[in-house]
A protein has these predicted regions:
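Hydrophobic ligand-binding cavity/cleft-lining segments
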Residues: 1-49
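Intrinsic-disorder/low-complexity, polar/charged segments enriched in Ser/Thr/Lys/Arg/Asp/Glu/Gln
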Residues: 6-12, 49, 67-69, 93-95, ...
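Generic structural detector for well-ordered beta-strands
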Residues: 12-16, 43, 71-73, 82, ...
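Short strand-connecting beta-turns/loops that link adjacent beta-strands
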Residues: 18, 47, 77, 103-106
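Hydrophobic pocket/interface hotspot
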Residues: 22-26, 32, 50, 72, ...
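Hydrophobic/aromatic beta-strand elements that line small-molecule binding cavities or substrate pockets
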Residues: 39-40, 66-74, 94-102
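Glycine-rich portal/gate segments that line the openings of hydrophobic small-molecule binding cavities
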Residues: 44-89, 143-156
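Beta-strand/loop substructures that line and gate deep hydrophobic ligand-binding cavities in soluble
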Residues: 86-139
Length: 156
């Protein structure tokens, strides 16, 4: 039996770095991923596709590992980086986008993430596992944003 957890997150923040510098990091998946916490391995699948293998986490007496793959596309003129899930890779489907806007004195960054995580748990565990999985993912994304903000010279 399995439990499916849906995750929808949105963030907006400003950094001191120039938009071109921000785009260069966020459009380079390995560079961007180096700021994401608890990544065990990032595997280049070719053609702009990457498989993310997260560190294993323990919840109660259960050990879980999130693995997913996404295909990335970027458009420098529009200041966008987006990714779509690759089905059949791992136990999650993750899509999202970055929108980078040059506001002269600062760079505005908007991050949106939609995910669906399938956990190998009995249905009765959903009430316990879903909020923990959501909170853990949200905590990692917030740490990722903090790490990127620091890399980009702090908040503007």
């Amino acid at each position: 039996m399995a439990v499916t957890v849906e995750i929808n997150l949105g963030y907006e923040f400003d950094v001191k770095a120039k938009a071109s510098e921000v785009f260069a990091v966020l459009s380079d998946v390995p560079s961007s991923a180096s700021h994401f916490p608890k990544v065990d391995q990032l595997v280049d699948l070719g053609g702009g596709a990457y498989r993310w293998e997260m560190e294993k986490i323990g919840i109660a007496s259960i050990t879980l590992q999130t693995v997913y793959a996404s295909k990335y596309t970027s458009n420098k003129a529009k200041g966008t980086v987006s990714w779509t899930p690759i089905k059949g890779e791992g136990n999650a489907l993750v899509a999202g986008s970055w929108k980078i806007t040059d506001n002269k004195k600062a760079t505005n960054i908007v991050l949106e993430i939609q995910g669906e995580l399938t956990l190998p748990l009995p249905g009765l565990m959903k009430m316990v596992a879903a909020p923990i999985a959501e909170a853990e993912f949200e905590k990692m994304v917030e740490q990722y944003i903090d790490n990127l903000t620091e890399h980009f010279g702090g908040e503007a």
